[in-house]
Structure formats: C-alpha cells, structure tokens
Amino acid sequence: MFIAHAAQARDRGAELYLVSVAKTAKGIREGNEHYPQVARTLGIPVLMANCVGPADTFIGAGGSAAWDSQGNLLAALDGPQEGIILLDTKNSSAVGVPLSMPSA
C-alpha cells in the first residue's frame, strides 16, 4: 500500500502515524494486514481511524485500530461500532471506547 508516505512522515520526525481512512469491509481486512507491517518496518505506532456507515457510494466498515511500534494490535473497535480509540504512546497501550447514540 503506502509505506513510502509513512516513511516520509517518520523521516520528518513523526513519532506516530495517524491514518484517517474511508474503508469498506474488504479495505479494513487489507488495512489490518498492512498497518501492522508499517508499524514494524518503521518502528512507530500506527493509529487507524475509519468511518462507519454510509459514505458516498459505499458503506464504511468501522474497525478503527491501534498498533504499537512492533506491530502488535493494542485495541480495535468491533465492525460498525461507533467509538474512539485512546492511544497512550508513552506506555504502549490503547483502549477502544464504544460510543452509544441516545435513544430517540
């Protein structure tokens, strides 16, 4: 995929690669293979934020995730669940916090 972009960011001093994506279920499967490799290869944590639900002509699959600098998965949100991932780069830990919508 796009490791050159991440490498350029790291070479310019980035200590975290933050990726905002709009991926389908297929794209998330590919991202879950690619981004841990980016983390391992470049030695920096990766935080991937995906959209959830209808987006233009497709359905965003959710599945936002964070990996440490060795490519270990630290946290991920389940599929189409809205939420936020809190990544602590100092302690190499993360937590996925689901968000629930208020009932109408």
Annotate each PLM feature:
Residues 1-42, 48:
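Active-site beta-loop-alpha substructure in enzyme catalytic cores
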Residues 37-38, 51-104:
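C-terminal beta-strand edge segments of enzyme domains
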